[in-house]
Amino acid sequence: MVFDVDGTLVLSDRSLGHYDVLPGAREVLTELRSRAIPYLLLTNGSAYPPAEQAEKMRRLGLPVDDHQMLTPSSVAADLFVRRGLARVLVLGGEGVGHALRERGILTLRPGEPTSGKVDAVYVGWHPGCTMPDIEAAAMAIWGGARLYTASDVRFFATKGGRTIGYSYAIVGALRRLTGARVTVTGKPSLHAMRYAAERLRLAAADIAVVGDDPLVEVLMARRGRALAIGVTSGVTSASEWRRQPPPRRPERVLRALADILEFVRPPGSGVTTRGPGAPPRGRRRRARRAASARQ
């Protein structure tokens, strides 16, 4: 299983300094672990390195090992290594580039003296972004660097309600300036879905993706042929879920997170929605094919 974090398991304040655990989160993860059902947390937040974020979850009582915490930077580091991108200009805090450096990628910051070509610009959590930062990134893109971002999502759920995503705003400025195409490494990209599946050592069809955003977790699950499960504890209410078009509509919407335990099975037997109100398997496969054709 792949769980979203903000709005699904926890709610944070705007500064990410304090978290509240959402109902059922501790119990669900603890039960999954006791049943030997593998799970990961996949956040679009890039402020902290994965191990540091996992430690924050453990302090809240959530059973999350370091290797079970994935961020967009985890995906980006893997993607950059695969594509041979060795020099990356990072727009973001110290935690944004940590996973890249762990994979041997040279990370550069705006204003630092550089020699040699910049291969990519990577935008993450950057509340202190300045115009000189944007100019440095634009110059690198004009010089041939590819544009990547941790997240291209407008909002995420916090205790204060919907909060804008910094990287969305920064990338908007860079795209307007340069006309560059952007590659998203976090949700809802297929890069994120495939990386999570590789880490779980499962086919996407055997994975459930649980989240609160139709444009993020559900869209990623649909694109990747995973099972999409929606929750109402974040940015989307039950009535809003019902109004979603088919490509953004989950196969189940949970009244409570703990309801997910009704229809998960151990590794090797897949994930099923054949609990109360679940569609027959044939209908589920046909719905997936129809949704895929419309994308």
Question: What is the predicted role of each segment?
Answer:
Residues M1-I37, A51-H67, A77-R294:
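Asp-based, Mg2+/Mn2+-dependent phosphohydrolase catalytic module
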Residues S46-P49:
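Canonical radical SAM enzyme core domain
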